[in-house]
Amino acid sequence: MMKNILAIQSHVVYGHAGNSAAEFPMRRLGANVWPLNTVQFSNHTQYGKWTGCVMPPSHLTEIVQGIAAIDKLHTCDAVLSGYLGSAEQGEHILGIVRQVKAANPQAKYFCDPVMGHPEKGCIVAPGVAEFHVRHGLPASDIIAPNLVELEILCEHPVKNVEEAVLAARELIAQGPQIVLVKHLARAGYSRDRFEMLLVTADEAWHISRPLVDFGMRQPVGVGDVTSGLLLVKLLQGATLQEALEHVTAAVYEIMVTTKAMQEYELQVVAAQDRIANPEHYFSATKL
């Protein structure tokens, strides 16, 4: 059965971020994506200027009520949330999650707790980080912080891989069954590799791939693609190891393709066949 995912995150008209980054790769892996946009911007914010608007929180709820009215909400297998335009949007999203789970008790909630990177030009609204700590984390089945977000969620520094696994398990004690640490950065084993962790109460998997050097301007949307693809693989029945290995390879293929084409925006369409069938392989290690 094809899986249906309600993806609630940002949308850009030009380029790739949020749903505009994740939607096509997720579909390419065989999932139906129902994109519900928290913001509609001309382009992502790292250009330094953009136009567009943040959707009123009630807009999100109204759209989902429309899906419920045609009796299709029970076919939703998961809710994915990413970049929020406001903390109030987050509260509406949790209402949507409750509504979806009432219609389909098997449905999962995947929270990508985007909290902003001022140094990268990623700006989030006031109250969003607090929302994730207090409400998003305990409500989620799967949560996917990067290192900075992991430290905010567990409320202490994380200096190495062992501490990252322990921190992930602190989060698991508060609600989610699975934690993806999307980018270990300075807490990883190696400074010249891109490393991730996938952790449950009784398993921890580590994976690394080469960093792709884009100089000063790193492409945006890599985390959005990573979260979306991991959710698809897990819904399709992949093991933790299989899901982590496929996602790591698929994202690497997108990065390599983007660099080869000398582009700043992720080249998800050009890389589509290698998203489904990666040419590279990276082996995950059980810790």
UniProtKB/Swiss-Prot annotation:
A GO biological process held by the record? pyridoxal 5'-phosphate salvage
Top-level taxonomic group: Bacteria
Q: What exactly does this protein do?
A: Pyridoxal kinase involved in the salvage pathway of pyridoxal 5'-phosphate (PLP). Catalyzes the phosphorylation of pyridoxal to PLP.
What are the annotated GO cellular component locations? Answer: cytosol
Q: What is the similarity comment for this entry?
A: Belongs to the pyridoxine kinase family. PdxY subfamily.
Q: How does it assemble?
A: Homodimer.
Under Enzyme Commission nomenclature, its number is 2.7.1.35
Class of enzymatic activity (EC top level): transferase
Q: Which SUPFAM superfamilies match?
A: Ribokinase-like
Q: Which CDD domains match?
A: pyridoxal_pyridoxamine_kinase (cd01173)
One Pfam assignment: Phos_pyr_kin
Q: Does the keyword Transferase apply?
A: yes
GO molecular function terms listed in the Swiss-Prot or TrEMBL record:
ATP binding; magnesium ion binding; pyridoxal kinase activity
Q: Which gene encodes it?
A: pdxY
User: So where does ATP get bound?
Assistant: D112, A144, E149, K182, R209, P210, L211, V212
Pathway entry:
Cofactor metabolism; pyridoxal 5'-phosphate salvage; pyridoxal 5'-phosphate from pyridoxal: step 1/1
**By what name is this protein known?**
Pyridoxal kinase PdxY
